[in-house]
Every structure is written in structure tokens, then in C-alpha cells.
UniProtKB/Swiss-Prot annotation:
UniProt keyword annotations, A-Z: Blood coagulation cascade inhibiting toxin, Calcium, Disulfide bond, Hemostasis impairing toxin, Hydrolase, Lipid degradation, Lipid metabolism, Metal-binding, Myotoxin, Secreted, Toxin
Assembly and interaction partners: Dimer.
GO molecular function, one term: calcium ion binding
Protein known as: Basic phospholipase A2 BnpTX-2
Protein source organism: Bothrops pauloensis
Cofactor(s) the protein requires to work: Ca(2+)
Main subcellular location of this protein, as a coarse class: secreted
GO biological-process terms attached to the record: arachidonate secretion; lipid catabolic process; phospholipid metabolic process
InterPro entries: PLipase_A2, PLipase_A2_dom, PLipase_A2_dom_sf
Length: 35
């Protein structure tokens, strides 16, 4: 579900998963690991 997907992103990034559909695959914009 969309909630489970958001929870997965939250666990991966340790920060708020919004907008999770935009940040997915490119965390560099959020200062992340740049997948």
C-alpha cells in the first residue's frame, strides 16, 4: 500500500517521506545517499 511504501522510505532515509513519490530513486535533493 501507499502507507507501507511511505514507511519503507521513512526507514531508509530516517526523515519524513514526503514527497516520497518525487524523492524515490534520487535522495540527493534531500541531502540523502543518492541512490
Amino acid at each position: 500500500s501507499l502507507w507501507e511504501f511511505a514507511q519503507m522510505i521513512l526507514e531508509e532515509t530516517k526523515r519524513l517521506p514526503f514527497p516520497y513519490y518525487g524523492a524515490y530513486g534520487c535522495y540527493c535533493g534531500w541531502g540523502g545517499q543518492g541512490q
